């Protein structure tokens, strides 16, 4: 401390000199390439009276707006900040025209509690003592959360002379800071072509359009721009691709609101979103759908028909799903088909040349997946150009009635959820969230939102859905167990409930409980069509009880699910089949349902199972990653509640501090419950307390640390004291939500647990506290696109390991087991359902820290059989010895039993064949066979060494294999 201050100040001359040095190098760049970079660049009228000071991409929009306004005689300009730190006051002042009478500073950030945002404060300080010292300086916020900033909003800034502090892009009806914005302006250069593509997350639309804009930019004399707008769902969400190209530079850093070409890649969107209304008169609309003329007449909403007819829209259709099936691409990968159709209709490049370039791009993009995949894409490109059909628009469409769009709406349910859905979620899911005012969020300022709102979405995104045939069902409940989205559920109905069920519902007598009728409820509109359920169904005599059939043919059956899933849980059924079993657990409501996870996701079945076992008393701290995205994709929340209103309390802090965050949640519970425990003791020891109250207090205190029984004891305690004339009792009842022992979980992926958050995970496990860590091990950073982590095995190809990872996978389980007092398990659901349930139940019951590492197949693996076979892939991983299932339970050692159990059998099957079944490995074999042979051999040997080591643990802890 005696020298720190001086040492820090010694560098001042270097910072003081830096602006001049940067300008010197800018001058050299300018000389070489003809640019005009300065520390602060001015653009606009030479005699400007109102200047905006800003930095970043918004400056292009401001420049485009300035061109429009200056042409109309306005005296406006912009100063673009090129070097923010060190901030050169002299350079800023020199950049501002002498004629300026007002300055508006735009900041793309919010600093609550400050007198202004950073750039504004710097500008005010820089102007002090200059010739602009008395010039009014206004400050505005814009663009938070990627909020669109349009020319009309920039005009509002220039017209503002009253609000010294303001916002643009929103309607602030709470603090009234927002500026009124006029009608949308068209400020793009003449001849600019605007195209917008509406796709379904994971259908390839975004990837295809990235290729399209590269093709246009690289093979024409046009400038090109692309921007992709989509929600945070892992797949199945709405994607919008905005493409612009033209002969002049494009400065439009905002979304397209009027397009020359609009493509809808999912037919259900025509009933949900305003798409054709975005077209200019005479524009082109391409719809991917299976409908002929009669089908279009039946399915197109009246307002869509009327707009097409009255605005001279050229209308085309193509059946991308049919072409996808015919070419082997499958029903969901329609991207190259629609891309080919776009190039044919847009006529930017001659058709033959466009097809040639698309095929080259497809080879570059998919070549690592094999020649077969490339050939299918080429066939899809050819057919996409051939099978477009122009629709002759009937004259009658001009007078078609406006029927309104289908929107999310809640008519029943919990009051908090209904309010949230109808005021916020419905708008957001209809792509109208930008229209919501600030006041809509007045009840949610702390970031808390209601649980269970994903159930109101009913997206209907699957092409095919499971259809249940009771004749072939053995009531094993495996389909429900593996379903990533909780859309298929076994339901036990009483005779009265079965009689009251909607007509046509499929049922069968319930095995082992003759007083009940069994049905398999399927939510078609929440299904993603992955097919995992049908894949694992054992059926009878080789015939499965589940078949994947067209959603359109079974959409009307949604009412069966809505009825059955709303029936009360049968506690006697759960008791009969035991909740800690595969079958029994599925009779409990999943408290994670209808998430935004990918079809076939390997992570959500584990999380869903945990909520079925402990969800009514769970706290979850979730690391940023896939599990936080499917765990809470605003505005819909898939974590939900049971009929008592109990469910997981979920929160996400950051990526790197999640373990510490979860640990903090645990300590907070401990402190709160400790205070309540003391009060319960006071009540029990009171001479005035009735015996039944004392008994309830004693039961609560006796079960205080037992999560399995303390919940029931808590209910008895609250019931016993709720009407007591006692201040202490009233305080206990007031805080009843904190009374019961909670099940504290920490969720995250391998990128968090093995890499960035490892220090925190290690700290929490070392603490000895009763806390559970669940690692969804996909062996890559899944959420950010498949980067290598320390969980990535030798030879796997991933980002940052494009040539195959040279080093072996980190042995996280062994590190945790080295403490000796941490429960550790490795599981793979598809390999051993029972072991997965047992490990999760044991981990939660263990009175100390636990770590579960769950193998989770991911789309980044490139499973050649497809994600419908994710559970099969888990089975093969264990069967071949690639993954090992085991449990280390220190509590057993205290009982004189073996603490270690190796659940996996000795490896069998072809290890190399397993590796070659996934693109992440096979692509290396295609690119560099010799290297692949070396690394794959190393990978296999490492797997054998792991199994040898695990067998040594079996002997060390004194059990037979």
Where are these regions (language model features)?
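Conformationally flexible catalytic loops at phosphate/diphosphate-handling active centers
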Residues: 1-41, 860, 872-901
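Glycine-/acidic-rich phosphate or pyrophosphate-binding loops and their flanking alpha/beta elements
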Residues: 27-50, 63, 179-192, 455-456, ...
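Active-site cofactor/cluster-binding pocket
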Residues: 86-91, 99-102, 106-117, 191-201, ...
